[in-house]
Amino acid sequence: MSRFCCFGAGCSEFSGHASTSSGKGKGIQGQVKVSYGFYLVRGMTNHPMEDYHVAELAEEKGNELGLFAIFDGHLGDTVPAYLQKNLFANILNEEEFLTQPDRAIIKAYEKTDQAILSHTPDLGQGGSTAVTAILLNGRKLWVANVGDSRAVLLKGGRPIQMSTDHDPNVERSAIENRGGFVSNMPGDVPRVCGQLAVSRAFGDRNLKSLLKSEPDIKVEDIDYTAELLVLASDGLWKVMNNQEVVDVAKRFKDPQAAAKQLTAEALKRDSKDDISCVVVRFRM
């Protein structure tokens, strides 16, 4: 049976057996016209789709918000599904959200992770990355992330990486200080205790003593030089660099078409993982 899932002005049809899903929407925040589109493709794997997204224009206490996210799950889809439903709500419910957004985001990430861990019997032993972008009144963009899902802003004609790839090798010292290790097997990526390919994530109860869910956060002004934002799971970033991604995306006025083309290009480059992509365009 199909179900309809609408985000802001966009609407997409999802089917339990479908290998793709897509949608788009648009609105105005202050002087900025915002349009967005998303496209998701299930990878060449035996498990169900583990990538989830959010793409929505909303209003909170008289403020106009753009809420965009990618959640890339592992060992099941229960944790990314939980994040899709709860993470932004938890951020917006923080009293400090409008006065100290950075602090509110960090607190909400931690509270959400604790809630996931407390629901382990229901949510299982899996986990998820997260990259979240909040556009406030068309003027400020906050991006936070844990894991290797990435956000890149095209501004002033150049790509600005708004997220941090949490690589086990980079955080090796912290992992070892907590009693863990990082494996580097030939032909494989670095992994925490030979298992997880990221050093920060939601969930992952069995590795939680070695992992953090504290996000890195970056803030940028959105002005006339800001053209577009791309959020995607590592199914895209494993085979395309930041410059290549924005070069493809900027060719399309329709952000949904841009997202679809990016996933097609990743598949052409032999990406086997789930691929999820959200493209947001800004126009003054």
UniProtKB/Swiss-Prot annotation:
Origin species: Oryza sativa subsp. japonica (Rice)
GO terms of molecular function: metal ion binding; protein serine/threonine phosphatase activity
CDD domains on file: PP2Cc
Cofactor binding summary note: Binds 2 magnesium or manganese ions per subunit.
Required co-factors: Mg(2+); Mn(2+)
Superkingdom, natural source: Eukaryota
Leader peptide range in chain numbering: none
Cited SUPFAM superfamilies: PP2C-like
Keyword entries, A-Z: Hydrolase, Magnesium, Manganese, Metal-binding, Protein phosphatase
Biological processes annotated in GO: signal transduction
Protein name as annotated: Probable protein phosphatase 2C 41
EC number from the UniProt entry: 3.1.3.16
Family matches, as InterPro entries: PP2C, PPM-type-like_dom_sf, PPM-type_phosphatase-like_dom
Record-stated family: Belongs to the PP2C family.
Binding site for Mn(2+) 2: D72, D234, D273
Catalyses which reaction(s): O-phospho-L-seryl-[protein] + H2O = L-seryl-[protein] + phosphate; O-phospho-L-threonyl-[protein] + H2O = L-threonyl-[protein] + phosphate
Keyword 4Fe-4S recorded: no
Residues in PPM-type phosphatase domain copies: 35-282
Amino-acid positions noted as binding Mn(2+) 1 in the UniProt annotation, renumbered to this chain: D72, G73
